[in-house]
From Swiss-Prot:
Binding-site positions, heme b: 45, 65, 94, 97
UniProt name for this protein: Leghemoglobin 6
Source organism of this protein record: Medicago truncatula (Barrel medic)
Family in the record: Belongs to the plant globin family.
Keyword Heme belongs to the record: yes
């Protein structure tokens, strides 16, 4: 099944909703990650020495990058049917930080919860599926770059 124009539009519109409250949704995203995997705190330089998830420019920049990469994956999937990493160093960075397969599952869950929060009454299974497909394609490419 190919990624449709509608799926791309759903990802784009909910990404814009996410960016409307980047500070709040960034804190929400990392709070969900640490609730699921407290040990993951050490993977993020902007969290490892803090008492908890505190808003910061680094936290917002990283969240915006993660969500932006998934949005870009949606665009690539619709246009070409595949995803190519724009940053070849992503694999090496994830290896250096100690990221392992279960971390991708935790991030996916946190991403979906955050988008659900941002989308509000526009949340739907169709929206969830669009984000899941785009995230899974991105995660697959990052994992390939890690091997």
């Amino acid at each position: 099944m190919s990624f449709t124009d509608k799926q791309e539009a759903l990802v784009n519109s909910s990404y814009e909703a996410f960016k409307q409250n980047l500070s709040g949704y960034s804190v929400f995203f990392y709070t969900v990650i640490l609730e699921k995997a407290p040990a993951a705190k050490g993977l993020f330089s902007f969290l490892k020495d803090s008492a908890g998830v505190q808003d910061s420019p680094q936290l917002q920049a990283h969240a915006e990058k993660v969500f932006g990469l998934v949005r870009d994956s949606a665009s690539q999937l619709r246009a070409t049917g595949g995803v190519v990493l724009g940053d070849a160093a992503l694999g090496a960075i994830h290896i250096q930080k100690g990221v392992v397969d279960p971390h991708f599952v935790v991030v996916k869950e946190a991403l979906l919860k955050t988008i659900k929060e941002a989308a509000g009454d526009k949340w739907s299974e169709e929206l969830s599926t669009a984000w899941e497909v785009a995230y899974d394609a991105l995660a697959t490419e990052i994992k390939k770059a890690m091997s």
